[in-house]
Structures are given as structure tokens and as C-alpha cells.
Curated annotation (Swiss-Prot):
InterPro entries: Thymidate_synth/dCMP_Mease, Thymidate_synth/dCMP_Mease_dom, Thymidate_synth/dCMP_Mease_sf, Thymidylate_synthase, Thymidylate_synthase_AS. NCBIfam families: PRK01827.1-3, PRK01827.1-5, thym_sym. Belongs to the thymidylate synthase family. Bacterial-type ThyA subfamily. The active site is at 146 (nucleophile). It catalyses: dUMP + (6R)-5,10-methylene-5,6,7,8-tetrahydrofolate = 7,8-dihydrofolate + dTMP. GO terms for molecular function: thymidylate synthase activity. It comes from Salmonella arizonae (strain ATCC BAA-731 / CDC346-86 / RSK2980). This is Thymidylate synthase. Pfam families: Thymidylat_synt (PF00303). Coiled coil: none annotated.
Length: 264
């Protein structure tokens, strides 16, 4: 994951000081891209320990179309707690947009099911896209989508995906986002009888929060270790039938975790 450390250094060296919605302050750059060959290992940051339980359960939660944190709490995942209301609701965030995008005539579009059908029946299409950025519902969301738009691409029986992330918390959020979408590519590929290809991450406002500087320098002082390997133990009947226990990360030997405050 040298690319990730190089991005951190670039933000430190070239970033512009900016104010932000949370009032914390950031160093920010605009526009950056990283490419991860998923055949070379699972792109999970090794210079600090990442919480795999949260990454996997959050993705499964998105795929169910869920927008209440009850499922996450049942599985000891608290990463959305700060944004939920007293009933645990988040409004029409990622899961709702992925699985039930509302149409003007009162119907809903299941973007994930549509994408699966396209990959199986029209893999050369240039329209294999999922968007979470629903401008008509942004005001109802507890948090506007950061990872907002992703596209799939098939070549030589390999499935690749490019994500556009309009806002990126490099220290806390980005390791989660990379691993989550890499996992999604592997799952989609398995369901479509393809191999995993590349995951391409493209960032808009790419920033380090001012209260993450000490942690960033500590992480940059560490040497990256070998990437782990993802093993999917079975092939469920559908993309929506995966369980947490279906996934195993082999050979993950990270440096110790580094705590940092979340900007809310």
C-alpha cells in the first residue's frame, strides 16, 4: 500500500489549508488517482490495523438497502453512530440509493441488481454505473455520500471498478473505502463468473484533518508489509446472500492500530 502512503505525503507536502463543514480544518488537495491490481493481493492498509469487522458488515449492510444502524449494532459496529438519529435512522443514505432509488412515478430502481444483470448480459456496456448522489434527497441524508459514483468494466474476463469519491478523509476513511470496494469487486466477480481485475480510486477533495497530523506522521514512519489475500469460502445464490463468515483475510500482519478522532 505504498500508493496510500505516497498520497498522505503528497497532502502533507502540497495541501492547501482549508476550512470544512466540521470546523476542524484540513490540508487538502484536489484530484488524485490510485490503481490497485486485485490479483496482487487484497488492498488493506498494513501500516496500521484496520477493523475488518466494520468494513465487511458495513458493505453487507449497504447491499441489503438498510439505512438504520440496528444491524451494525447487532454486529458490534459503531462507525455510523455519530450521524444516526434517536431511532438509529440515517435517512436515504447509500443503501437506499443503491437498492431503491426513487423515480418520479413512485417506483424504485435497484441499481445493484441492474448492474449485475448488465455484467452478465451486456458486459461491454459503458453504462454499468451505480450512483449514490441523489440531489433530490441530499437534504434528507444524515451525511451526503462521500463515495458517490462507481463504474464497472469488463475486459479479458476480468472485472474492474472505478470509484469517484468527492470527499476523502485520508487517515480514517480512505483505508475503509479502498478495502470495501475491493471486496465488492471480488463479490461481483464471483457472482458473474469473472476474475477480479483492478480497483481504481479517484478522489476529489482529498484531505487530512488538522487533528490527524501526529497520527499521519507516525504512520508514514512505518514500513508497509506484504498485502494479505482475500478468500471467499463459498458462492452464495446471490450477491445479497453473503454472510460475514464467508470471508477470510489470509496473511494480514499489520502494524498496531492508531487512534484518531472522527470529524463530525
Amino acid at each position: 500500500m505504498k500508493q496510500y502512503l505516497e498520497l498522505m505525503k503528497k497532502v502533507l507536502d502540497e495541501g492547501t489549508q482549508k476550512n470544512d463543514r466540521t470546523g476542524t480544518g484540513t490540508l487538502s488537495i484536489f484530484g488524485h488517482q490510485m490503481r490497485f491490481n486485485l490479483q496482487e493481493g487484497f488492498p488493506l492498509v498494513t501500516t496500521k490495523r484496520c477493523h475488518l469487522r466494520s468494513i465487511i458488515h458495513e458493505l453487507l449492510w449497504f447491499l441489503q438497502g438498510d439505512t438504520n444502524i440496528a444491524y451494525l449494532h447487532e454486529n458490534n459496529v459503531t462507525i455510523w453512530d455519530e450521524w444516526a438519529d434517536e431511532n438509529g435512522d440515517l435517512g436515504p443514505v447509500y443503501g437506499k440509493q443503491w437498492r431503491a432509488w426513487p423515480t418520479p412515478d413512485g417506483h424504485h430502481i435497484d441499481q445493484i441488481t441492474t448492474v449485475l444483470s448488465q455484467l452478465k448480459n451486456d458486459p461491454d456496456s459503458r453504462r454499468i454505473i451505480v450512483s449514490a448522489w441523489n440531489v433530490g434527497e441530499l437534504d434528507k441524508m444524515a451525511l451526503a455520500p462521500c463515495h458517490a459514483f462507481f463504474q464497472f468494466y469488463v475486459a479479458d474476463r476480468k472485472l474492474s471498478c472505478q470509484l469517484y469519491q468527492r470527499s476523502c478523509d485520508v487517515f480514517l476513511g480512505l483505508p475503509f473505502n479502498i478495502a470495501s470496494y475491493a471486496l465488492l469487486v471480488h463479490m461481483m466477480a464471483q457472482q458473474c463468473d469473472l476474475e477480479a481485475g483492478d480497483f481504481i480510486w479517484t478522489g476529489g477533495d482529498t484531505h487530512l484533518y488538522s487533528n490527524h497530523m501526529e497520527q499521519t506522521h507516525l504512520q508514514l514512519s512505518r514500513e508497509p508489509r506484504a498485502l494479505p489475500k482475500l478468500v471467499i469460502k463459498r458462492k452464495p445464490d446471490s450477491l445479497f446472500d453473503y454472510r460475514f463468515d464467508d470471508f477470510e483475510i489470509e496473511g494480514y500482519d499489520p502494524h498496531p492500530g492508531i487512534k484518531a478522532p472522527v470529524a463530525i
